[in-house]
Amino acid sequence: MSQLVDTKKLSPSNQVIFNIMLRKAKIEDAQAIQNLICFYSEDGKMLFRSLEDIEQNIEDFRVYEKSGEVVGIVNLKFGWDKLVEVRSLGVDPRFHRQGIATEMVRDAIEQASLNLDCDTVFVLTYAIPLFEKLGFQIIDKINLPQKVWNDCQQCLHQGNCDETAMSFSLLPFRKVSVINDNNNDEVLIPQ
């Protein structure tokens, strides 16, 4: 499996390049984010998001910037029974096949792993090979909690979902310490 990028190990000059390329979205990015979402939502490949919704949730977006232009987007939605969803993943078609989506999913995994309340990343996707190469496993949609499906009410494919559910466990990436409790049982403590 591919390694996640540790920006602390990059030289200072490379950190600047990396942070410019793949970074937390800013409010100024909202229109560019919506433009990519609109492109993919026109044919039902992504759920439409209003500009207002994007602006209200801008802190949950990451963008891939190339030459000052937002060419890739991804959104993480936290809050379901230790699950985090990778959603609104899209790359400007002019920049397809350059590894941008791969880097964005790796970054999303890394961002999700920083939240100790999350054990699993999941996605509903058409891009099965992309997620498989990054270690995601196909799962039955029925295993996802019902509240996950709230966003699907506005989907063109509601009631006949043709996306594949996939998941990725964050637990192997957690740093833990093993201690003995009062019963001399080993207990894992996240660090």
What spans do the regions from the language model cover?
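Conserved beta-strand in the GNAT
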Residues: 63, 69-78, 82-90
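A short helix-loop-beta-strand connector motif used in the catalytic cores of GNAT acetyltransferases and
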Residues: 53-67, 159-162
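Short, high-confidence coil segments that cap the C-terminus of an alpha-helix
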Residues: 59, 117-118
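Conserved active-site alpha-helix within GNAT-family acetyltransferase domains
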Residues: 125-151
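Conserved hydrophobic beta-strand within the GNAT/NAT acetyltransferase core sheet
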Residues: 118-124
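Conserved acetyl-CoA-binding loop-helix of GNAT-fold acetyltransferases
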Residues: 91, 97-112, 123
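Short amphipathic alpha-helix that is part of the acyltransferase structural core
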Residues: 4-48, 65, 163-165, 172-191
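Cysteine-cluster motifs in flexible loop/terminal segments that predominantly coordinate metals
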Residues: 149-163
